[in-house]
Amino acid sequence: MHKKNRHNQGYNFTALVKAHPGLLQFIIKNQYNNQDTIDFANPQAVKALNLSLLKSEYHVKFWDIPDGYLCPAIPGRVDYIHHLQDLLAATPKTLLPNKTPINVLDIGTGASCIYPILGQREYDWHFVASDVDPISIKVAKHIISSDKSLNRNINCRLQPNSNQIFNGIIAEDEFYHLTICNPPFHSSLAEASKGTARKIKNLNKGNHSSKNQDKTLNFGGQKAELWCPGGELAFIGKMIKESKAYQKQVLWFTCLVSKKDHLSKLKLSLKKSDAKQIKVIDMAQGQKISRFIAWSFYDVN
């Protein structure tokens, strides 16, 4: 994990239960080391853990999402935020317009609105949080309206056209230092279901409980969160094409890339689009390696 990640040392379940007593019912023993953990294949357990973390570490008093919506793991999400800050810090000052605060566009914020919440709490960034799902936007608005700082810094916008990403969201007079995105990885519902089942099987290896092995879709996630025609390669490809129209309004476009094999094709697309800077930033959470691709139409010189 990033050196600034608050969760580098694992979870302090005593403190987490104190922050949110509802977590206690989900704590179990890991069968290999007998340490406290939760069943990460149980979305209710992950939801309770998230609320505990948000309360204890980020001072967010209210956070709730409907059943069936993606419940993100906070340590990995905040890692993306810290690496984005590193990206900005490494950017020549001549490319950083004298505009404060830092403005960020989150594509596909989801009902959890997790990236804007973490970005506001860690760096006081300002966000536009967009999504194609009206329920996600409604829930996200409800969450941020309960906190003055979040409400001041985060603006939720519905994307009315599911075939568009930046179009219809970025206004003519707006400038963003960053765009961020956790794209739909899979190309079909069947592929998404297989991926979820595989994750559940792997997670259950470390727990006594195996009762969740048949809950194939219980990780949560609506269609737009999990899959789209062509999967992440097609989605990011569309993002690259649209980004050209906003090359003067965005300093860094970024997007998570699940499959490393996609990087070569994405880099080629970016070169054809005349991107001036292309970066791939690796992130590690335990044995898991994730990454995001970043591009800019601003020349480093």
Swiss-Prot record:
EC numbers for this chain: 2.1.1.181
Q: Name one GO cellular component term.
A: cytoplasm
Checking InterPro entries in the record gives: METTL16/RlmF (IPR010286), rRNA_lsu_MeTfrase_F (IPR016909), SAM-dependent_MTases_sf (IPR029063)
Instruction: Provide the GO biological process annotations.
Output: rRNA base methylation
Q: Where in the cell is it found?
A: Cytoplasm
A single Pfam family it belongs to is Methyltransf_10
Which terms in the Gene Ontology molecular function aspect does this entry carry? 23S rRNA (adenine(1618)-N(6))-methyltransferase activity
UniProt keyword terms in alphabetical order: Cytoplasm, Methyltransferase, rRNA processing, S-adenosyl-L-methionine, Transferase
Return the broad EC class.
transferase
Main localisation: cytoplasm
For the keyword rRNA processing, the answer is yes
**Transmembrane stretches, by residue range?**
none
List the catalysed reactions.
adenosine(1618) in 23S rRNA + S-adenosyl-L-methionine = N(6)-methyladenosine(1618) in 23S rRNA + S-adenosyl-L-homocysteine + H(+)
Gene3D superfamilies, alphabetically? Vaccinia Virus protein VP39
Q: Would the keyword Lipid metabolism be found if you checked this record's keyword annotation?
A: no
Family membership, please give it: Belongs to the methyltransferase superfamily. METTL16/RlmF family.
Q: Tell me the function of this protein.
A: Specifically methylates the adenine in position 1618 of 23S rRNA.
Protein name in the entry: Ribosomal RNA large subunit methyltransferase F
Q: Which organism is it from?
A: Colwellia psychrerythraea (strain 34H / ATCC BAA-681) (Vibrio psychroerythus)
Gene field: rlmF
